[in-house]
């Protein structure tokens, strides 16, 4: 993947526009989870250190496009950055006609979704973004799968368009896991529905030595083996697809599970064989035997790609399967890459972030990359690198 990298450029005295992913949860004007901003700090600091005139922007939430709304302002992000960088950070609301920035100064440009035409990748808007800078830095992997004015169009018209350190690291880590992985390569795909992850499962079945399925997805495979799954979440219409995958790939289907008669945090967890599930029961987690079998597989892996929990880990009684799998990944010597919102929540819950080789900041972009789809923002950077 040939793109210009920010780290290869001389930024001194240049106007730099960084498109970051600062779409963080905010409550009462305060940032409640700072993971995405923390991930962007090294990029900001590197540009400031070189004496660049630094502008950074992002979307936040889903405001009505073209209208300012205090609820979706980047002001809480500015407050956070001021505290972390121990220096003043300016928030610019009106910036499309130009912004004055001093060398070594950081200015945050207000939520891009307040600008009409952002989501449609409007050319006039993209040109206005491009005219603000000498160098455009795309560093938001989480939005690289969307062709929008601040992620795609601007890169077409900016004097120079490059990949920031975070985006470069994401692409390298995913490339390492997918293009020529150290083997055995094990992929874990959890989540509620096969339908939303069918392309991912299909792609990974051709790359992985073993494909682990969890959550509602695993229930469809349990049903495909002819077992009663009771009131479990599963997709009857996708049983033929599941059967095909069972033939083409090594998928360790659960042999024991934790079930309940209701979907609730206080429901009693009943451990049983997949042969014995009753009509009024639903599978909410893996059983001990199945979880341990997965842990043994992960112990011998050399590459692990993890997307999605293997049970309803939000309920303490049905957390064990995901915890056993998560700790096995943490203890493994494999190169491990994890992505997706629920996966990151599980990593936080079990406190294993420092034991995962690479944690991806992208949800949809992570899945689309794994599916083998081209990410529009990355394609544009590749095109600009050829010019």
Swiss-Prot record:
Membership in a protein family: Belongs to the phosphoglycerate kinase family.
Pfam families cross-referenced by the UniProt entry: PGK (PF00162)
Keyword annotations of the record: ATP-binding, Cytoplasm, Glycolysis, Kinase, Nucleotide-binding, Transferase
Protein name: Phosphoglycerate kinase
GO molecular function: ADP binding; ATP binding; phosphoglycerate kinase activity
GO annotation, biological process: gluconeogenesis; glycolytic process
Residues involved in substrate binding: 21-23, 36, 59-62, 113, 146
């Amino acid at each position: 993947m040939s793109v210009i990298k920010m780290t290869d450029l001389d930024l001194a005295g240049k106007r730099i526009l960084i498109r970051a992913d600062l779409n963080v949860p905010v409550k009462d004007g305060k940032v409640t989870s700072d993971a995405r901003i923390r991930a962007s700090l090294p990029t900001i600091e590197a540009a400031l250190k070189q004496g660049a005139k630094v502008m950074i922007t992002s979307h936040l939430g889903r405001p009505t496009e073209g209208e300012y709304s205090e609820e979706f302002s980047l002001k809480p992000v500015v407050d956070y950055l001021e505290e972390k960088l121990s220096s003043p950070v300016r928030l610019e609301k009106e910036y499309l006609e130009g912004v004055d920035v001093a060398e070594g100064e950081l200015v945050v440009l207000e939520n891009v979704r307040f600008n009409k035409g952002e989501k449609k990748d409007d050319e006039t808007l993209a040109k206005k973004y491009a005219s603000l800078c000498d160098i455009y830095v795309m560093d938001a992997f989480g939005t690289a799968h969307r062709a929008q004015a601040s992620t795609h169009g601007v890169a077409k018209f900016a004097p120079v368009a490059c990949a920031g350190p975070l985006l470069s690291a994401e692409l390298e880590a995913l490339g390492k896991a997918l293009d020529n992985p150290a083997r055995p390569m094990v992929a874990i795909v959890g989540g509620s529905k096969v339908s939303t992850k069918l392309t991912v499962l299909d792609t990974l079945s051709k790359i992985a030595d073993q494909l682990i399925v969890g959550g509602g997805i695993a229930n469809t495979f349990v049903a495909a083996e002819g077992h009663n799954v009771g009131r479990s979440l599963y997709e009857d219409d996708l049983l033929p697809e599941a059967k095909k995958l069972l033939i083409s790939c090594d998928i360790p289907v659960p042999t024991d599970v934790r079930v309940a008669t209701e979907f609730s945090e206080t429901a009693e967890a009943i451990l049983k064989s997949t042969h014995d599930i009753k009509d009024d029961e639903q599978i909410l987690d893996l059983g001990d035997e199945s979880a341990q079998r997965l842990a043994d597989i992960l112990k011998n892996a050399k590459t692990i790609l993890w997307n999605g929990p293997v049970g309803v880990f939000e309920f303490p009684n049905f957390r064990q399967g995901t915890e056993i799998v998560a700790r096995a990944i943490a203890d493994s010597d494999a190169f491990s890459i994890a992505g997706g919102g629920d996966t990151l929540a599980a990593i936080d819950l079990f406190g294993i972030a420092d034991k995962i080789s690479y944690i991806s900041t992208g949800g949809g972009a992570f899945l689309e990359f794994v599916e083998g789809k081209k990410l529009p923002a990355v394609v544009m950077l590749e095109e600009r690198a050829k010019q």
